[in-house]
């Protein structure tokens, strides 16, 4: 009867440890985005009925599941447990299928995501010239955002602030040569809406890269777990 390959056994452990680390990173990043004060205020303010944190909550769940599967894979390899390895294989296969389905749906519904993002930000632009308590809270967050990212307004630049421009004037002030002029003041020519869209597009590329790398690890995990499962059964 053939024995269990030590090389395969510890390769399985190593790749599952990487898998567990990936789950930890996804969970940590998703939680950070979820509790980030400035980002939360900017994204969730407004009258949009769409919850922009649905995707973040899904990532928190996915990160937790990946951590559990990584643990099952590591323990199943070290303890040579066929039950743990089978649970790991089934769970990992389901995640890979869901990941591929999510990628296809994400590509198909990208225009819808852009529409939701535009609607949310356009609604928020109205808050800049408003005087309600909700608007004031959003304006404070926008002033911080403008100062940090060197942009002004959301849709129409400094004009979005209306009569509230005096309060936002300092955060919009441009000291370079490539500046726009509004009410006699030099302001940043770039709107925060265009900046947020640029950041969104760049982050999508990063997410795609992470998803591709994770898929490679998942496929290796499936192969190693099934081979190890068969070797343990033939002892």
From Swiss-Prot:
InterPro entries: Tetraspanin/Peripherin, Tetraspanin_animals, Tetraspanin_CS, Tetraspanin_EC2_sf. Disruption phenotype: Tspan8 deficiency results in a lower body weight in male mice fed a normal chow diet, and in a lower gain in body weight upon feeding a high fat high carbohydrate diet. No significant body weight differences could be detected for female knockout mice. In addition to the body weight and bone density phenotypes, male knockout mice also exhibit lower circulating levels of free fatty acids and glycerol. The keyword Ligase does not apply. SUPFAM superfamilies: Tetraspanin. Pfam families: Tetraspanin. GO terms for molecular function: integrin binding. It is found in: Cell membrane. Residues 34-52, 106-203 are extracellular. It comes from the Eukaryota. Keywords: Cell membrane, Glycoprotein, Membrane, Transmembrane, Transmembrane helix. The chain crosses the membrane at residues 13-33, 53-73, 85-105, 204-224. Residues 1-12, 74-84, 225-235 are cytoplasmic. One of its GO terms (biological process) is regulation of gene expression. Glycans are attached at residue 118. It is a multi-pass membrane protein. Forms homooligomers. Interacts with MEP1B. Interacts with integrin alpha3/ITGA3. Interacts with RICTOR and MTOR. Interacts with ADAM17. Interacts with ECE1. Structural component of specialized membrane microdomains known as tetraspanin-enriched microdomains (TERMs), which act as platforms for receptor clustering and signaling. Participates thereby in diverse biological functions such as cell signal transduction, migration and protein trafficking. Promotes ADAM17-mediated TNF-alpha processing through recruitment of ADAM17 to tetraspanin-enriched micro-domains (TEMs). Forms a complex with RICTOR and integrin alpha3/ITGA3 to mediate mTORC2 activation and AKT1 phosphorylation leading to cell migration. This is Tetraspanin-8. The lineage of its organism: Eukaryota, Metazoa, Chordata, Craniata, Vertebrata.
């Amino acid at each position: 009867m053939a024995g269990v390959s030590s090389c395969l056994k510890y390769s399985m452990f190593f790749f599952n440890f990487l898998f567990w680390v990936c789950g930890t990173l996804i969970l940590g990043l998703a939680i950070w985005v979820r509790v980030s004060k400035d980002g939360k205020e900017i994204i969730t303010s407004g009258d949009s009925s769409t919850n922009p944190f649905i995707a973040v909550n899904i990532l928190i769940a996915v990160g937790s599941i990946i951590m559990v599967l990584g643990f099952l894979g590591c323990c199943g390899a070290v303890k040579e447990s066929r039950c743990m390895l089978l649970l790991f294989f089934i769970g990992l296969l389901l995640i890979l299928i869901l990941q591929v389905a999510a990628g296809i749906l994400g590509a198909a519904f990208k225009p819808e995501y852009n529409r939701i993002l535009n609607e949310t930000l356009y609604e928020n632009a109205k808050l800049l010239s408003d005087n309600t308590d909700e608007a004031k809270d959003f304006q404070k967050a926008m002033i911080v955002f403008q100062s940090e990212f060197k942009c002004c307004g959301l849709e129409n630049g400094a004009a979005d602030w209306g009569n509230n421009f005096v309060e936002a004037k300092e955060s919009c002030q441009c000291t370079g040569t490539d500046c726009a002029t509004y009410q006699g003041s030099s302001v940043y020519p770039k709107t925060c809406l265009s900046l947020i869209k640029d950041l969104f597009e760049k982050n999508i590329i990063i997410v795609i890269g992470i998803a591709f790398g994770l898929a490679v690890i998942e496929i290796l995990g499936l192969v190693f777990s099934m081979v190890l499962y068969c070797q343990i059964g033939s002892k």
